[in-house]
UniProtKB/Swiss-Prot annotation:
Residues 1-28 are cytoplasmic. The lineage of its organism: Bacteria, Pseudomonadati, Pseudomonadota, Gammaproteobacteria, Enterobacterales. The chain crosses the membrane at residues 29-49. Residues 50-276 are periplasmic. This is Cell division protein FtsQ. The gene is ftsQ. Pfam families: FtsQ_DivIB_C, POTRA_1. PANTHER family: CELL DIVISION PROTEIN FTSQ. Residues 56-126 form the POTRA domain. Keywords: Cell cycle, Cell division, Cell inner membrane, Cell membrane, Membrane, Transmembrane, Transmembrane helix. It is found in: Cell inner membrane. Part of a complex composed of FtsB, FtsL and FtsQ.
């Protein structure tokens, strides 16, 4: 058989196989394109569905944490101030957290989303241990904050006063001097520090102490030592101690005031009973 005839026969045998390979390759390409188109269209539809606020709105608000000053409406209004709430997928919880922490009595807020439509917020409020310059409060760490006056209630707190930015210093002084006074059953009602670092105290019995600058603890100890003598003199004279000025190297200047009528009558009755 000639070489030409052999080549012709081989060519005829390969043609059907080549056609099948081409068809398979084309089918594979079409299938891949179909899959890609399906994924793209599906992703587009799902993304649109997730971004549709009518399908996945953050419509539920859950608040946790110990609250004394925060009302539900405070949080709701803080969130609405940012505009209409986003969807579960699009809402940035960090923005909400920052907005809530702008409330002056909020120490910390933790915000997270709960599928499918819930916003969970955990609140930590500042805990006041004293009032600061009448208008604010101070916590145990020396942080100052404010609370709406109608939410404070009847909570009785010591009063602290000082220059702006000195809350931590005044609080530390209040604690140290309060510990000294507590040993003799005194309680600090008020502590004030001037811009020159001069201290004035008011005790729970109404006595005012002027400690001046420097040696405050030494001067406070002097008052504790003098108090029994001053108290005895007050009872003898039928007066009360109004103030004690301790800005001296030794001794003190004492201011006296009349007893309130009820205390004066009580002392007179007690004296008469002792005479009988």
């Amino acid at each position: 058989m000639s070489q030409a005839a052999l080549n012709t026969r081989n060519s005829d045998e390969e043609t059907p196989s080549s056609r099948r390979n081409n068809g398979t390759r084309l089918a594979g390409i079409l299938f891949l394109l179909t899959v890609l188109c399906t994924v793209f269209v599906s992703g587009w539809v799902v993304l649109g569905w997730m971004e549709d606020a009518q399908r996945l709105p953050l419509s539920k608000l859950v608040l946790t944490g110990e609250r004394h000053y925060t009302r539900n409406d405070d949080i709701r209004q803080a969130i609405l101030a940012l505009g209409a709430p986003g969807t579960f997928m699009t809402q940035d919880v960090n923005i909400i957290q920052s907005q809530i922490e702008r409330l002056p009595w909020i120490k910390q807020a933790s915000v997270r989303k709960q599928w499918p439509d819930e916003l969970k917020i955990h609140l930590v409020e500042y805990v006041p241990i004293a009032r600061w310059n009448d208008q604010h409060m101070v916590d145990a760490e020396g942080n100052t904050f404010s609370v709406p006056s109608d939410r404070i209630g009847k909570q009785v707190l010591p009063m602290l006063y000082g220059p702006e930015g000195s809350a931590s210093e005044v609080l530390q002084g209040y604690r140290e001097m309060g510990q000294v006074l507590a040993k003799d059953k005194f309680t600090l009602k008020e502590a004030a520090m001037t811009a020159r670092r001069s201290w004035q105290l008011t005790l729970n019995n109404g006595i005012k102490l002027n400690l001046g600058r420097g040696d405050t603890m030494k001067r406070l100890a002097r008052f504790v030592e003098l108090y029994p003598v001053l108290q005895q003199q007050a009872q003898t004279d039928g007066k009360r101690i109004s103030y004690v000025d301790l800005r001296y190297d030794s001794g003190a200047a004492v201011g006296w005031a009349p007893l309130p009528p009820e205390e004066s009558n009580q002392q007179q009755n007690q004296a008469q009973a002792e005479q009988q």
